[in-house]
Curated annotation (Swiss-Prot):
PROSITE patterns: RIBOSOMAL_S17. One of the primary rRNA binding proteins, it binds specifically to the 5'-end of 16S ribosomal RNA. This is Small ribosomal subunit protein uS17. It comes from the Bacteria. Signal peptide: none annotated. Keywords: Ribonucleoprotein, Ribosomal protein, RNA-binding, rRNA-binding. Gene3D superfamilies: Nucleic acid-binding proteins. Part of the 30S ribosomal subunit. The gene is rpsQ.
Length: 84
């Protein structure tokens, strides 16, 4: 059965040094359950960039995919904003 609704995330490219792979940092705001203070929670995921078109600092959108390697489970969909 194919799954239609794939997760998508928006983040910033923090590394593009690997071949056909980028590291994207995802920053989310979560509320602390007791203190009700908003915290920035970040995580880094590796994403597949087939055409090697994204650069360091770009804002990108990635979607989940089948496992491509040991750590890559995301693919680049589009570049939302180029770095300056």
């Amino acid at each position: 059965m194919a799954r239609e609704n794939k997760k998508d995330l928006i983040g910033k490219v923090v590394s593009d040094k690997m071949s056909k792979t980028i590291v994207v940092e995802i920053v989310q705001r979560k509320m602390h359950p007791i203190y009700h203070k908003y915290l920035k929670v970040s995580r880094r995921v590796k994403a597949h960039d087939e055409r090697e078109e994204s650069r360091l600092g770009d804002k990108v959108r990635i979607i989940e995919s089948r496992p491509i390697s040991k750590e890559k489970r995301w693919m680049l969909v589009e570049i939302l904003e180029r770095s300056k």
